[in-house]
Every structure is written in structure tokens, then in C-alpha cells.
Amino acid sequence: MSGPRAGFYRQELNKTVWEVPQRLQGLRPVGSGAYGSVCSAYDARLRQKVAVKKLSRPFQSLIHARRTYRELRLLKHLKHENVIGLLDVFTPATSIEDFSEVYLVTTLMGADLNNIVKCQALSDEHVQFLVYQLLRGLKYIHSAGIIHRDLKPSNVAVNEDCELRILDFGLARQADEEMTGYVATRWYRAPEIMLNWMHYNQTVDIWSVGCIMAELLQGKALFPGNDYIDQLKRIMEVVGTPSPEVLAKISSEHARTYIQSLPPMPQKDLSSVFHGANPLAIDLLGRMLVLDSDQRVSAAEALAHAYFSQYHDPDDEPEAEPYDESVEAKERTLEEWKELTYQEVLSFKPLEPSQLPGTHEIEQ
């Protein structure tokens, strides 16, 4: 094995060799998942702490290669205060022949909503501010034509100033079969996506926001199902069994037959579920946790709800340029995905330190 690329150094972390530019110092592992492992580091060029994600086996298979390309393109496209932003992307490779590793550099966020819920009881003001930011980021993502599909507390990062960013969006499309075994994911998933009821739309993410908001208010998960059947039962105990109109929209005959076999359950009054909660919070939850996805509020509508009157500013809730999915919808070979990804890595222009939000011109 030859030495590291000029200007790079190697370090073994969690049984993985990392090869990174010398400006990234003090690498410390902070977590790992199915798609890669993450370290915190100090970026000497940006003069700030960052998160560095090393994608695991980015080109191991066609599915991996396509997902790698999609993740990089999504991160490059989305630029919003409440969505994780790409500060840099690099590879130790100097040619397409050697290209096998991809590293993504993003803003370092101290905690996620999972940590927050476990550590402290949140005031209603806290919940307002967090859910407002979550919906503000979601409005932006949805305006690009992207569906997150996997919103859950661990995918929502928060820093010490209570500023929130959405992580890991849009990746679950090809990865569904890998995620079915992962329990906590299911608790936040809209019934129509979990049970393949029908073609779903962006409001699957609104259901997830409802589940997250409920957890922030209660300090515990709203629908912690043990399996799909238990999950559905818990959901219907709160929102009631679907009306004939909703049943008619379910394209899966199997799902329809099963639901019709259940004893009818009425919709619960949410104020009996969330004792002492702000009535406006309960009203908003009632508009998000709706079985009929056509009746759920959109992110833009939810932002205008009276619960957020303290924060809502229609002139400061931006939308995105539409995201062109046609490139990744095409069938390509593994080598073609790799070549496209390599071009995306090379064409990325990192921000100068002076362009970062909240930073000033730094004298060199």
C-alpha cells in the first residue's frame, strides 16, 4: 500500500483507516450507522468544528453506488439553515481508477432530539421553537420535490442554542428493505408507507413530525409498536379506524381486508392523551396525525398555524430550487454511477470561511 496522498494523513479509527486532508485535526469517532461512520474534527481552514462522514463501501454494489451519488447530489442541492449543509466533500483518490472512498464534511451538531428527550422535560416554548424549525426545514425540502421518508428523533440534530437541522433525508428510497428490521424507525412512519397501502406523498413526513412533536410534549414515544400489527393497533387506538372513504383509497387488498376485520375504534380526544398541553399544540397535532394523507396539513400550512405565531414569518420561510431526480432515475452501470459521483466530488466548491453564516473575514 502506498503512502497517503500529498496533503493528507492516515489514522485508524474504529478498525477503519481514515485518510483525510491535514487541515482536519483531532478526529474523534461520534457514531456509525448502516451508511457510514462519523467523526468530529477541527477544520483549520474554516476554524470550526465539523462532522466528517466516511461512507461505508460507497461502490460495493449498484444500490450502494446509486445511493452514494444521490446523497452527495442532495447535500449539494439543499442549502437551508434547518437542513444539514455540505461544507466539503473529498476523496484521497487522485484518479477515477483509485476512487473508492467518499468523505462528506458537514456542520457539527452537538445532539439529536433523542438525546434531548431523554435528558430534560421540555417547556411548551421549547417545543414550539423546535417543531417550527423542523417544519421550516421540511417546507424547504418538500418545495424541492424531495420526500424525507425517514424522519425520526435521531435524524434531527440540535446544537446548544436549540438550533435544529434535519439529517439523512431522501436516502430511504432504495434502502427500505434494509430498514424493516429496525424498530425505532417504524414508530415514526406513516401507516401508508409502513404497510404499503398506496402510493404515498410528502405528507408521510408530516405524520412523522406529529409523532416527534408528541414525543417532545410527552417525553416518550407516541406509538412504540412491537411489530407492524401492534403499531397499527396503537395508531388506531388514538386516531380511530379508517372511514369507508379512507379505506377506499387503500390500494392493497390485503391491508383493506385486515383493517375491516378489526373492531371499530373511535377517534380519541387528543386532550385526554396530552394532559395539560397547550390547546394550540393539540389542535396542530390533530391536523398532522390524520390517517387520510390527503387531509393532513402541508409543512407550509402548519407553519402558519397559530401555535407558531411567535415565530412564523412568511418572508423568512424560503423554498428550494426544484431537484432534478431524472439523472438518478436512469438505469446505469456501477462504473457509470462511480464516474458521475467522481465528477460531483471534483466539481464541488467549498465555501470560503468568510461565506459561512455567522463568521467574519478571517485574516490569514
From Swiss-Prot:
Enzyme Commission number, as recorded: 2.7.11.24
Protein kinase domain segment(s): 24-308
Enzyme class: transferase
Post-translational modification: Dually phosphorylated on Thr-180 and Tyr-182 by MAP2K3/MKK3, MAP2K4/MKK4 and MAP2K6/MKK6, which activates the enzyme.
Catalytic activity: L-seryl-[protein] + ATP = O-phospho-L-seryl-[protein] + ADP + H(+); L-threonyl-[protein] + ATP = O-phospho-L-threonyl-[protein] + ADP + H(+)
Cofactor(s) essential for the protein: Mg(2+)
Binding site for ATP: V30, G31, S32, G33, A34, Y35, G36, S37, V38, K53
Pfam families for the chain: Pkinase
Region (Disordered), start-end ranges: 312-331
GO molecular function per UniProt: ATP binding; MAP kinase activity; protein serine kinase activity; protein serine/threonine kinase activity
Record-listed nilotinib binding positions: E71
Residues found modified as Phosphothreonine: T180
The entry's keywords: ATP-binding, Cytoplasm, Kinase, Nucleotide-binding, Nucleus, Phosphoprotein, Serine/threonine-protein kinase, Stress response, Transcription, Transcription regulation, Transferase
The organism's place on the tree of life at top rank: Eukaryota
Biased composition (Acidic residues): 314-326
Catalytic residues (positions): D168 (proton acceptor)
One GO process term, biological-process aspect: cellular response to interleukin-1
Activity regulation summary: Activated by phosphorylation on threonine and tyrosine by MAP2K3/MKK3, MAP2K4/MKK4 and MAP2K6/MKK6. MAP2K3/MKK3 and MAP2K6/MKK6 are both essential for the activation of MAPK11 induced by environmental stress. HDAC3 interacts directly and selectively with MAPK11 to repress ATF2 transcriptional activity, and regulate TNF gene expression in LPS-stimulated cells. Inhibited by SB203580 and pyridinyl-imidazole related compounds.
Motif placement: TXY: 180-182
Subcellular location per the Swiss-Prot or TrEMBL entry: Cytoplasm; Nucleus
Modified-residue entries (Phosphotyrosine), positions: Y182, Y323
GO cellular component: cytosol; nucleoplasm
Biological role: Serine/threonine kinase which acts as an essential component of the MAP kinase signal transduction pathway. MAPK11 is one of the four p38 MAPKs which play an important role in the cascades of cellular responses evoked by extracellular stimuli such as pro-inflammatory cytokines or physical stress leading to direct activation of transcription factors. Accordingly, p38 MAPKs phosphorylate a broad range of proteins and it has been estimated that they may have approximately 200 to 300 substrates each. MAPK11 functions are mostly redundant with those of MAPK14.
Assembly notes: Interacts with HDAC3 and DUSP16.
Domain statement: The TXY motif contains the threonine and tyrosine residues whose phosphorylation activates the MAP kinases.
Protein name: Mitogen-activated protein kinase 11
Species for this entry: Mus musculus (Mouse)
Lineage of source species: Eukaryota, Metazoa, Chordata, Craniata, Vertebrata
Gene that encodes the chain: Mapk11
